[in-house]
Amino acid sequence: MSRWTKKRIDEAFTALVTEHGYEDVTAAMIMEKADVSKTTFYRYFRNKADVMDYHYRSLYDAAFENENCKTLEDLFTLLFRTTREHPEELSLFDTIGYDSYREFIYNYTYRRGKQIIETAWGRPLTEREDFNIAYFCGGGARILEEWACGRYSGMTPEEAGAAAAKIIHGRYQVPIIKK
């Protein structure tokens, strides 16, 4: 039941954000569209930002788990493609603060990047290596936002993914090892 209920809430969230923009969507609107009670909604999510996090974490996790995602270039290409294929993301970039979409993108890419590198190297990152990953992901989150908003529209996701991968120092160019 929980997977089905979360899926309904997620689908309602996506439809409402596409129609109204993120800022104008409320938890009450999501509950009404998903046809779930307040108790049910809050059993799974704290607020609409939590639904946003669930939605995009699921979306990006699915891209990452894709069998064609073997290199960082593949991963960057998938991120750019996924962002371009989901125009509802545009209004999410208007959010600010702790629960903002920008913060989600940074945190997600940082955690995922750190996991990829540590898995490939078979050890935890040093403080300097962690700094490098965090710095790259901060800039990468900003570029992903600009990409979603139409900047660099002359580039395909493949071209953008290749360009992003070329920026990375050679020692960080690792294969993606899935567990």
Task: Explain the meaning of each model-derived region.
Residues 55, 78-117:
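Amphipathic alpha-helical segments used for helix-helix packing
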Residues 2-14, 18, 23-35, 42-69, ...:
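An amphipathic alpha-helix adjacent to DNA-recognition modules
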Residues 14-17, 60, 64, 84, ...:
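Regular secondary-structure segments
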Residues 98-144:
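Amphipathic alpha-helical packing segments from all-alpha helical-bundle domains
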Residues 25-26, 91-95, 156:
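Short, hydrophobic secondary-structure boundary micro-motifs
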Residues 149-179:
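C-terminal peripheral helix-coil segments that are non-catalytic and often amphipathic
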Residues 11, 54, 58, 107, ...:
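Short, residue-level hotspots on alpha-helical faces of the histone-fold
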Residues 18-20, 33, 124-131, 149:
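Cytosolic nucleotide-binding catalytic cores of signal-transduction proteins
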